């Protein structure tokens, strides 16, 4: 995009806007300047009720931000503290920052162009307002449709009955007729109220849709009677409505028939089959989210919380260990990567003398008591440690072992005074420490976070949190 020119496309191409912005990292890395990345953003229409703001790096898709009627877009940052931090890091004006708040996260985009930021915010805000207005109109139409009583007149009833049915649906004519009937018949009001109460009760009791039943046969009977010379009475609105109701039958019979058949079929199938529900969309959502129908609301909430935490039962099973390695071992055998805002172990190819110290996904907490925020800082800490030849002592602390776990077999040099006791004093030592040799001056201390969970078959295993 040369010269900072902005390209705008129509909805037919699905792409509405595109430009470069500096995107904010997750909240835990907000203060890290290196975590803010420049990305190419493309704003496209994802259906009739949402936008998709995708961002790319070197033509590779890195993620997307879903913007719907529940999202909010504004110029600047509402939090004064965050706004000051952004100004300090990037030397930008508040009008050059765009805030996008979604259901799951809050994003901040820096563009260094006030007009461009204002244009993007105005475009997305107007789209959200159109969605809300359309949704309100739809809800009003549905509410009016539920309150309105529709009458159906057969073309075989003649023009007089049709005109009466249409006239009764007109508000002005209906009010005039009602006023005249009240004056001529004193008992009209009581009868009318009874009819309304009975109709309301019928609607509450019969809340299923009605299906057509033998309409053609009914029409044939009417035609036959007209051919034989019998006169067709002109019906009022109530009589027309009653006649139409006789052409339909309730769905309750079909519903219970299908339910009985489904119960018989389900009894023949495996017991693990989920029961059929009347609301298919809700059933698919519950099944897709992995929620069991037999769980109580409290159990469902607890299960959802465990899923969000990565299947970690509680914090008491989280262990912090200190691992001591020489700089050559770290450089040659250990590979790290960034995932979900954390620094994790992607590969460990240590020799047999070191053993399987790390597992894929272990979370790096600190390097020589320094907490890195990115891979660049890890490399910086390791480089400085090698150049200064810092010496590190071997640390020992309380480590709680779950019953049946054998962590000491996974990491060489890990000992406990009693393998069956819980929360015993433990020490993480390397081979040269057990041989009573002097510790080298360039050993590195890497702190990792482990946790224990139970798999579905009940076997204990160690994974990263």
Swiss-Prot record:
Biased segments, Basic and acidic residues type: 258-271
Biased composition (Polar residues): 159-173
Chain intervals for the UniProt region annotation (Disordered): 159-179, 258-283
InterPro entries: PH-like_dom_sf, PH_domain, PLEKHS1
A Pfam family that the UniProt record links to this protein: PH
SUPFAM superfamilies the UniProt entry points to: PH domain-like
Domain of life: Eukaryota
Domain PH: 14-129
PANTHER family for this protein: PLECKSTRIN HOMOLOGY DOMAIN-CONTAINING FAMILY S MEMBER 1
Protein known as: Pleckstrin homology domain-containing family S member 1
